[in-house]
């Protein structure tokens, strides 16, 4: 089976944890939030690390002396983006799922020598949306348990405050009541 490192354990990261587990991958997740690391484990990550604690030696240690087959970047954090290039095995792949900064430094010789493929994701096609709905209906992706808080419209300010603090919440929903 493949090993996938997911950098960032927000909603996108948790979705990728579940997708990766669905195809039998070993999943290593990172984040700077202890709460989000706990969520990553809850959603199926085999290993969760504070972003500052994961390095290529640690990946090799828990992965039979190999780096990751795939790295999925679900954060805009510059150091995570830079680290992604060091976490991937020869002929592996990196997916930038989060929007990177306008200019990122890419170690082209390193990528060339290791024959690493880089992919970017932007938006979703109608077919992607249909597939996502199907996966949710089949209970292969659990979006409902990503909703950690719900606020009535009258408390929308409280909801936005919770989101902006980005502490112990994942997805916050505002209802029309």
What are these regions (language model features)?
Residues 1-53:
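Mid-domain Rossmann-like dinucleotide-binding core that forms the NAD(H)/NADP(H) cofactor-binding site
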Residues 21, 112, 137:
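Anion (oxyanion) recognition and catalysis
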Residues 82, 126-177:
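C-terminal hydrophobic helical "lid"/dimerization subdomain
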Residues 97-101, 121-124, 147, 151:
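Short strand-turn motif at the edge of the Rossmann-like AdoMet-binding core
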Residues 3, 38, 43-119, 157:
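Glycine-rich cofactor phosphate-binding loops and adjacent beta1-alpha1 units
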Residues 12, 16, 36, 59, ...:
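Aromatic/hydrophobic pocket-lining residues that form π-stacking "cages" and hydrophobic walls in ligand
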Residues 14, 112-115, 140-141:
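Short glycine/proline- and charge-enriched loop/turn segments
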Residues 30-32, 74, 122:
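N-terminal Rossmann-fold cofactor-binding loop
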């Amino acid at each position: 089976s493949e090993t996938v490192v997911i950098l960032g354990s927000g909603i996108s990261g948790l979705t990728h944890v579940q997708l990766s587990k669905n195809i039998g991958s070993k999943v290593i997740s990172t984040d700077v939030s202890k709460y989000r690391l706990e969520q990553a484990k809850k959603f199926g990550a085999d290993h969760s690390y504070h972003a500052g604690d994961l390095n290529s030696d640690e990946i090799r240690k828990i992965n039979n002396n190999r780096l990751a087959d795939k790295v999925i970047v679900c954060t805009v954090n510059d150091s995570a983006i830079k680290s992604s290039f060091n976490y991937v095995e020869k002929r592996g792949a990196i997916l930038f799922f989060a929007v990177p900064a306008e200019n990122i430094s890419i170690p082209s010789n390193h990528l060339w020598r290791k024959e690493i493929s880089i992919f970017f994701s932007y938006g979703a096609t109608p077919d992607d949306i249909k597939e996502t709905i199907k996966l949710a209906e089949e209970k292969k992706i659990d979006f409902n348990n990503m909703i950690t808080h719900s606020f009535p419209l009258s408390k929308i300010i409280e909801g936005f405050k919770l989101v902006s603090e980005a502490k112990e919440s994942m997805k916050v929903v505002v209802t029309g009541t």
